[in-house]
């Protein structure tokens, strides 16, 4: 099997607050896929970083009365810790506020400027005369000029997806002061996105993005691409534009370059990795971006055009997912439907949410509802009752009478062969990111394994001393089948997989599926994963609501 070299990224969390469980969907989705790729023997570098620039960060740090550099450093540490505790296997978690990103950004800007893709012109902008600052798109809200939906930001409508400028908003208001902004002129720099229309059409039609996402992008082509404003006026927290007085790069110019900067930093740590092998225009490696559907425009149009114009490679694929709702409602701090990652981790096992998201995730950009009642039922039924019960019910006898030694013979090889033959289909589902179908297939096998034990009832056979060897072979088969199931679940449940490797006294590898454990001793099974009780969920939601009230009062 040919080993592939891959670079996989997640969209960069914004460094102005804590991660919530909705944010974790993307990190979990990408991590499952990365872990599966590594099990197949592929060389994968998995990276992420905090998106650490912009007006929002500048204002938040002022509100907290600390330097923005201090604030983003603290938040990065928190984000990194949350991802680590959720088992997200990043090779590097960095920040866009870095020397590597700044140097690469300047290089890209210079290349684009030299090749004639940077234009300048005076533009009219909304200006908050109370705060003495130009208002970025995300600090203006008003009525969408197309669908007339109220409370929409100044760059695109969350309701209908229309892209527009803040000047097109109906009845705009400053998010900062609540006042109606005035219009002022300023000279800005623009990236000539329309010049890449044909290049982008070819790239998108090559299968680099999902079909439904490509259809959405085609709508933007029909409307005609517009030059992209890549500059912002002071005051601003970010990288200054070279040879430009009091002008800064717009956060969406340096944020995707943060992928490159983060990888460059990884190359400094590991001298065996070549930056150009992964980002050079003639790269033979694969580059994958996992993103949410709200940032399609930036990643599927602006970013590949910037890469093409600056003579770097374009992504192999961009995988788009939907949003997370909680009990059918949008995740919202003000409405008390926001559960921070740290709060979740104080109450529940991270593998449980990883599994639940896996049962919902597909290759499409559909929204996913985290229904907490269904969450309890699914975790208790599948992980506890089906998977862990299989290990628990079969290991006791083996230790009691045979000191943990498994039978050396497969009494019923047909069921074992059926289990390992499923690796081809389950592997294809993992590869295609159809995790929901993969979990369904794995749980079907778990049901078969438990039915096998129920059918042969080794506890009855074991009552007769002369038939204990026969009982051992049945119990041993239960352990063999548990091992196969845990190999399939290893990308999804890293914490449980680590425990299972200790219990089984062997590594869980895809390549070892065909060979059952022979002449092998297992360790005693210990209950470290327990059922979810409704009071744990109640405690988690209560803690979340209390945290939001305290945060609102203190900041």
UniProtKB/Swiss-Prot annotation:
Chain positions of motif 'HIGH' region: 13-23
Residues that, per the record, bind Zn(2+): 144, 147, 157, 160
Key words of the record: Aminoacyl-tRNA synthetase, ATP-binding, Cytoplasm, Ligase, Metal-binding, Nucleotide-binding, Protein biosynthesis, Zinc
Required cofactor names: Zn(2+)
Catalytic activity from the UniProt record: tRNA(Met) + L-methionine + ATP = L-methionyl-tRNA(Met) + AMP + diphosphate
One GO-annotated biological process of the protein: methionyl-tRNA aminoacylation
Chief location category: cytoplasm
CDD domains recorded: Anticodon_Ia_Met, MetRS_core
Annotated residues for binding of ATP: 333
Transmembrane segments: none
Annotated cofactor note: Binds 1 zinc ion per subunit.
Keyword Cell membrane in annotation: no
Cellular component GO terms held in the UniProt record: cytosol
Function: Is required not only for elongation of protein synthesis but also for the initiation of all mRNA translation through initiator tRNA(fMet) aminoacylation.
Assembly: Monomer.
Protein name: Methionine--tRNA ligase
Source organism per UniProt: Blochmanniella pennsylvanica (strain BPEN)
Lineage: Bacteria, Pseudomonadati, Pseudomonadota, Gammaproteobacteria, Enterobacterales
């Amino acid at each position: 099997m040919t080993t592939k070299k891959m670079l996989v990224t997640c969209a960069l969390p914004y460094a102005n607050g804590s991660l919530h469980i909705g944010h974790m969907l993307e990190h979990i989705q990408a991590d499952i896929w990365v872990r599966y790729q590594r099990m197949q023997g592929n060389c994968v570098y998995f990276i992420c970083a905090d998106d650490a620039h912009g007006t929002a960060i500048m204002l938040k740090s002022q509100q907290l009365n600390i330097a923005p550099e201090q604030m983003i450093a603290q938040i990065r540490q928190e984000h990194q810790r949350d991802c680590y505790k959720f088992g997200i296997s990043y090779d590097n978690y960095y920040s866009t506020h870095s020397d590597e990103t700044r140097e690469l950004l300047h290089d890209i800007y210079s290349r684009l400027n030299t090749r004639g893709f940077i234009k300048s012109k005076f533009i009219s902008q909304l200006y908050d005369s109370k705060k003495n600052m130009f208002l970025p798109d995300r600090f203006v809200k008003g009525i969408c000029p197309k669908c007339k939906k109220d409370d929409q930001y100044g760059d695109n409508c969350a309701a209908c997806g229309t892209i527009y400028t803040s000047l097109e908003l109906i009845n705009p208001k400053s998010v900062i002061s609540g006042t109606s902004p005035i219009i002022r002129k300023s000279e800005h720099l623009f990236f000539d996105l329309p010049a890449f229309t044909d290049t982008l059409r070819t790239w998108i039609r090559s299968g680099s993005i999902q079909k439904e996402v490509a259809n959405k992008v085609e709508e933007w082509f029909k409307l005609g691409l517009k030059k992209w404003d890549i500059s912002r006026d002071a005051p601003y927290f970010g990288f200054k534009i070279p040879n430009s007085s009091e002008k800064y790069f717009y956060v969406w110019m340096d944020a995707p370059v943060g992928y490159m900067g983060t990888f460059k930093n990884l190359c400094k740590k590991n001298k065996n990795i070549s930056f150009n092998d992964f980002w050079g225009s003639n790269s033979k490696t694969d580059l994958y971006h996992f993103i949410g559907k709200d940032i399609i425009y930036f990643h599927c149009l602006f970013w590949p055009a910037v890469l093409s114009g600056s003579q770097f490679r374009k992504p192999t694929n961009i995988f788009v997912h939907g949003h997370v709702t909680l009990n059918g409602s949008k995740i919202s701090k003000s409405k008390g439907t926001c559960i921070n990652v740290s709060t979740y981790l104080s109450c529940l096992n991270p593998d449980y949410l990883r599994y639940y998201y896996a049962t919902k995730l597909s290759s499409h950009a559909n929204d996913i509802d985290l229904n907490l009642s269904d969450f309890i039922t699914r975790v208790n039924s599948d992980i506890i009752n089906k998977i862990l019960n299989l290990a628990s019910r079969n290991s006791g006898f083996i230790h009691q009478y045979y000191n943990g030694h498994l039978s050396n013979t497969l009494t019923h090889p047909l069921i074992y062969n059926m289990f390992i033959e499923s690796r081809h289909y389950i592997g294809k589902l993992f590869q295609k990111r159809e995790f929901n179908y993969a979990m369904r297939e794995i749980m079907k096998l778990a049901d078969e394994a438990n039915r096998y034990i129920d059918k042969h009832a080794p506890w009855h056979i074991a009552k007769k001393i002369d038939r204990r060897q026969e009982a051992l072979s049945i119990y041993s088969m239960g352990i063999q089948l548990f091992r196969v199931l845990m190999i399939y679940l290893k990308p999804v449940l890293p914490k449980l997989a680590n425990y299972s490797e200790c219990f089984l006294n062997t590594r869980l590898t895809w390549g070892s599926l065909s060979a059952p454990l022979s002449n092998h001793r297992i360790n005693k099974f210990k209950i470290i994963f327990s059922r979810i009780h409704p009071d744990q969920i109640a405690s988690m939601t209560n803690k979340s609501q209390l945290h939001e009230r305290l945060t609102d009062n203190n900041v």
